[in-house]
């Protein structure tokens, strides 16, 4: 299992309790910050199942929880009920055969987490290399969004720009 690198605290508003949100492998978990109990209204009794693992700290933007996953993607969930609102997929999975075996040639995962400009509603994330890390022969081309810094407009649900470092 992959390590988790943080959580986010949401201070109580109105009658609600303060909450903690954190990834737990293929789950996004919400607990009450005061007593450690699951927030039952969030997802399935406090847990949202993810398609792929998330290992970095989430962020709160407006009424949403924002996470990155190894799909690779940036995903936005309603912080009250855990419903997936939208996602930005960073790199489509590509499978190729090599010597009779099937390999995943995607990658470009946002391992390092992301920064959030709350005022402007922009998430800035960084990505790693494209898949089959030590041999690039089977992944020719630009490998869009791999080894990149990407700015995503959370209000308008779109990419603003990307800068590929290599």
Say what each PLM segment does.
Residues 2-27, 53-74, 102-138, 148:
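Repeat-blade elements of multi-bladed beta-propeller folds
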Residues 1, 13, 28-52, 74-104, ...:
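Extracytoplasmic/lumenal domain signature
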């Amino acid at each position: 299992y992959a390590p988790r690198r943080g959580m986010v605290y949401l201070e109580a508003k109105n009658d609600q309790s303060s909450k903690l949100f954190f990834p737990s492998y293929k789950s996004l978990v919400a607990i009450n910050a005061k007593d450690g109990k699951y927030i039952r209204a969030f997802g399935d009794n406090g847990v949202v199942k993810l398609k792929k693992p998330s290992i970095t700290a989430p962020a709160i933007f407006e009424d949403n929880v924002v996470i990155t996953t190894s799909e690779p993607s940036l995903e936005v969930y309603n912080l009250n009920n855990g419903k997936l609102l939208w996602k930005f997929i960073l790199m489509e999975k590509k499978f190729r055969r090599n010597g009779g075996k099937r390999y995943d040639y995607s990658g470009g995962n946002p391992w390092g987490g992301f920064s959030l400009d709350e005022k402007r509603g922009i998430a800035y994330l960084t990505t790693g290399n494209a898949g089959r890390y030590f041999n690039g022969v089977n992944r020719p081309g630009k490998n869009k969004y791999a080894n990149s810094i990407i700015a995503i407009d959370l209000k308008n649900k779109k990419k603003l720009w990307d800068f590929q470092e290599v």
